[in-house]
Amino acid sequence: MSNATPMVRQYQELKAQHPGTLLFFRLGDFYELFFDDAVTGARELQITLTARHKERGDPIPMCGVPHHSAANYIAKLVRKGYRVAICEQTESPSKAKKLVRREVVRIVTPGTPIDPQLLEPRESVYLAAVCAQGETVGAAFLDISTGEFRATQSSGRDAWERIVADIESYAPRELIFPQALSALVRAGFRNEQKTGTLPLARDGMSDNLQIVDEGNMATTDDKLKFVGLPFTLTALDDWLWQTEDCAALLIKQFGVRSLDGYGLTNKHEAVRAAGACLRYAQETQRAAAAHIGDIVYFEPQDQLILDQITVRNLELVEAMGGASRSLLDVIDETVTGMGARLLRSWLLRPSIRRGEIEARHGAVAELYASHIKRDHLRSLLKEVADVERLTGRLNLGSATPRDLVALRRSLDQVPSIRDLLANGESSLLQVLNDAADELADVRALIANAIEDDPPAKVIDGGVIRAGHSTELDELRSLSRDAKQMI
């Protein structure tokens, strides 16, 4: 468009850097979509499609949503399989010399959600990765909202089938894989509901990643579905899966010298899958994701593999036909989202290690035998927020002041929980008690710095307690008493 305004050119440049996404472009109090993105957004969100620059005879399709409710619109698009690039104004309009600087600060994909609108409190949301070399297949599973990170590897003629069963058991929202593996992946998951591609390519000027345009959303030729939940297929450029680069990325993330302590020695395909998973998460979040602090390697024989047909027929997590309740519905008496997600994972991926099973039974038996201790423990846990996801939002820079207060109130329960479990006989309860850190310094810092009832957003002010920061107190005084001082 030769006569494009500076703002439109800025949009086009950012869009060119992030093809394969719908670009939410911040303009004042709205996020705007232009050109083909606007047509798609208006159709999928059922909002009005209008046009910009009609008077010039070359109208630009556009639609928009208010920034304060954008999360709900983004959630609708991501649930449909779209990927959304969020572009923010990164300088104040009053300070901008000409055009306000804007940058893409995050890409929301089906497998990397952190916003509450895209998360179920009692279910994990996994990004999965799969790769293969010969008869060895590796896979990794990452819940970026909590930092849970797992990897596995299988070898032999039936390795692919075993890994596919693992992937089905995790029910990821998104599966990434090397482009070279596209035919095998699409054949293996041809019964699913929707697919998509978001390949990343190396920028010729740097080591940053660029998204290669293969469309905003998938075609519907292939079908992807597990227990009623569709997931998206995402092909990534093959260079992202180099073993040495993936290992180096994981080592840097975990702050270690080698991956031997994680059971990943000579597990090259597991390392490749995990490294690609981590890189994809970091690139979409535009953050280091420091809450992803370790990884658990598991052997296929460590757990019972239940394929999707078995899970459905046994009604483990979803009832069939006229049944009103699944097995999970019947037994789930957990009082925290963290406990609910753990119970669900135990049902879908049962351990077959005798020691682990007996330890769980011992802990349950002890609490079952003492209803006083059990009821007291449940009352304490009811005061605990979803600390896993709270810390995830903190590390990804999306936490609110109220999240900090919720974290402090949750940590306030830890000393009482430890006291309650201190004299337990169960080996598992003892291990949990010994591992629990009361984080007294963190609790004290939040209590001293943050108001008990802060506003929802930092920008609203009134978050930091008076007296915590001398500099802030002086600035508040200047703001409050400016007229008198003048």
Map each language-model feature to its residues.
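Charged catalytic and DNA/RNA-contacting regions of genome-maintenance
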Residues: 1-366, 379-382, 386-395, 399-485
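Conserved interaction-surface patches within small, structured recognition/assembly domains
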Residues: 369-373
